Structure formats: structure tokens, C-alpha cells
A protein has these predicted regions:
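Conserved beta-strand positions in repeat-built beta-propeller and related beta-rich domains
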Residues: 28-32, 68-83, 123-128, 163-168, ...
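Short loop/turn segments that connect beta-strands within beta-propeller blades
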Residues: 40-44, 93-97, 135-139, 175-179, ...
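Blade-level signature of beta-propeller repeat domains, shared across WD40, Kelch, NHL, RCC1
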Residues: 195-227
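A short loop-to-beta-strand structural motif that recurs across blades of beta-propeller domains
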Residues: 35-37, 87-90, 130-132, 170-172, ...
Length: 227
């Protein structure tokens, strides 16, 4: 088990729940506003735009689309006319930023993490707890494996996939072909609440939305140094 240090950057985002590195920019879905923020490596805001997401959780980018985990009824902001209070996976055009389509979750339950993987899409599931790989064109399940985690953020690293867990406060790397555990990071008591995950230059990044039931009274985005 590796020792870990969390290296935060400054952020003005109130509830950064999911994050994804893409083209040297960090895309973050804010659970408070359901807006997407685009940041540089130091956390400076480059852009911000609204979405039709509700209770935004995971975010990933693939095939020139932004994919969002819209995790059902929001508790972080007032309801909007566009809210359905149902969990969906949203598909947004990268250029227009408009909603192109939406898909039910593979297990019919809530959804936290998403991760693009060579033309396919990983999705977290809770009925039972599992990681599910789907075809993003029709959401047919290609592969899945059950896990002993309450899954949240996801990040692909080679033949492995990292998954964070807010309940047991750990981040586990699985072999994405068979579900075997490869590495495990235990988060210290004074560490962040691991919502989102992404990876850049072989370095893991995390986000802590500080909602609901926060471990600490402030949000955080940063990188993870393993020793």
C-alpha cells in the first residue's frame, strides 16, 4: 500500500464533483450549479458554461463529446424546469455545448463516475456495485465486474482503471480486463473526500465537492503524489 500526499490547487468552484483532463485543460462539473468549468493547470478559470445536468457528478470526454453523469434529484440547488429527477448519462457536443442525447444508466440506478476508454464508456453502478463498460452508441453492455466499493470517480491508466470510494475512503486500481485489484490508496483521516478522479501524465487528480455530509468544510481540487 502506497503512502499518499494530496497537493491542492486554488479553485473558486463551490462543489467540484467530477473532473476530466482533456487537451491540457481540466473540465470540472460543479454539483452546485451544474455548470462545467474549464481550468488551466494552476486552477485559473478559462471558461464556464451551463448544462441541462441535474446533480452533476462524473464527467468524461470522448469522440468529440462531453459525457455527464446526471445523478437524479438535486439537493444542492433549487429545482429547474429542465430537471427530471432521474439518473441519466448526458451526451453534449464539444463545440456547440448543446445536449445531443441522454441515456438511462445501465443498472437503472444512480451514477457517479464516467470514463472514456478507446471508443467505449465505463460507468459506475450500484445495483450491484460494479464497473460497467458500454458501447456509447447504444449503451449495450460490453463487460462488467462487481467491486467491493461504493464507486465514485474513475480514471484509466494503461490496462488499469482507478475508482474512488467516499464511504471507505480509498482509491483502488483494477485490471480492467478481469477486475483484479492491482493497487490501493488509503486516504488519511485529514485527507479529502474523493469524489472525482482523472489522470494526466501518469499523475492522478481528484476533486472534493464537500457535499453532501462533507469530511471537511471546503471544496478542493488537486493532484495525488504517491510515494
Amino acid at each position: 500500500m502506497k503512502k499518499v500526499e494530496f497537493l491542492p490547487i486554488k479553485t473558486e468552484i463551490e462543489m467540484p464533483n467530477g473532473l476530466q483532463w482533456h487537451d491540457k485543460k481540466l473540465y470540472v462539473i460543479d454539483q452546485k450549479t451544474d455548470n462545467i468549468f474549464i481550468l488551466n493547470e494552476k486552477g485559473k478559470k478559462l471558461d464556464e458554461f451551463s448544462t441541462l445536468c441535474e446533480n452533476g457528478s462524473g464527467i468524461t470526454i470522448g469522440d468529440n463529446f462531453i459525457w455527464l453523469a446526471s445523478n437524479g434529484e438535486t439537493e444542492a440547488r433549487p429545482f429547474r424546469g429542465s430537471d427530471t429527477h432521474i439518473s441519466w448519462i448526458l451526451k453534449l457536443d464539444m463545440n456547440s455545448r448543446n445536449l445531443i442525447s441522454r441515456f438511462p444508466t445501465p443498472d437503472g440506478g444512480g451514477v457517479h463516475g464516467l470514463e472514456w476508454d478507446n471508443g467505449l464508456l465505463w460507468v459506475t453502478a450500484f445495483n450491484p456495485t460494479a464497473l460497467i463498460l458500454v458501447n456509447p452508441d447504444n449503451f449495450e453492455v460490453q463487460f462488467k465486474f462487481e467491486i467491493d466499493q461504493s464507486p465514485h470517480g474513475l480514471a484509466i491508466e494503461g490496462e488499469g482503471i482507478w475508482c474512488s470510494d467516499r464511504v471507505d475512503r480509498n482509491i483502488i486500481k483494477y485490471n480492467k480486463s478481469n477486475g483484479k485489484i492491482l493497487e490501493k490508496i488509503e486516504i488519511p483521516d485529514d485527507g479529502p473526500d474523493p469524489h472525482g478522479l482523472s489522470i494526466k501524465d501518469k499523475i492522478l487528480w481528484y476533486s472534493d465537492a464537500a457535499f453532501p455530509n462533507p469530511m471537511r468544510p471546503f471544496p478542493e481540487i488537486g493532484s495525488i503524489e504517491l510515494r
